[in-house]
Amino acid sequence: MLLANPIAPDNLLSGSGALVVLAIVLFAECGLLIGFFLPGDTLLFAAGISIATGTITSPLAAYLVVAPIAAVAGNLVGYWIGYTAGPVVFHRPNSRLFRPEYVTRAHEFFERFGSWTIIIGRFVPIVRTVVTVMAGVGRMRFALYTLYSVVGAVLWADGVLLLGHQLGKIQFVRDHKNWIDYLVIVVVILGFVPVAVHYWQGRRR
């Protein structure tokens, strides 16, 4: 009897494990300062395609519920970090993962869009991590912050999932399911490359 290939797409992307991994990545990217370069967009898009092609066997509804919840949970943790320790974090010297230019970029968003930054920034990597902490530092009203976080999480997480799901319904994609599955895995792996590169550059300094 042949052993199953652990790196085959059907094994990597099927079952509840994929949903757990996605939830962890979204939580970290949306709330923890170490989550700057985690490929949340890529994973959401890949999950949508994989659900449509049948590689992921969990129902789409489960992802549409869990993904926004994970993102909002991350936001609330990020707000708490900013509220309790933000000034200390933002005034630290350059570290391998956190740099002043990230704060500057997020601050520019706040200057331009105000509270709407919580929603708009959700679609911008790095910004979606920093603005949550900055909202806590700025003592943004918690109820308003939570409302914007929920709206932004649903629009972003479910929007990208559904976009990938619709693409996965295209006949060409379904006819080349095996190749698409491998392509999805390659794209997801490439999404983690910036993390490794950034960490390596930090170690060289």
Question: PLM features: what roles do these ranges have?
Answer:
Residues 29, 155, 189-192, 196:
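Hydrophobic membrane-targeting signal helices
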Residues 23-42:
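Transmembrane alpha-helix interface/packing and boundary motifs in multi-pass membrane proteins
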Residues 1-24, 49-144, 169-187, 194-205:
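Membrane-interfacial helix-loop-helix
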Residues 158-170:
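Transmembrane alpha-helical segments of integral membrane proteins
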Residues 43, 73, 151-159:
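Membrane-embedded alpha-helical segments of transport systems
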Residues 28, 32, 57-68, 154-155, ...:
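Hydrophobic alpha-helical transmembrane segments of multi-pass inner membrane proteins, especially
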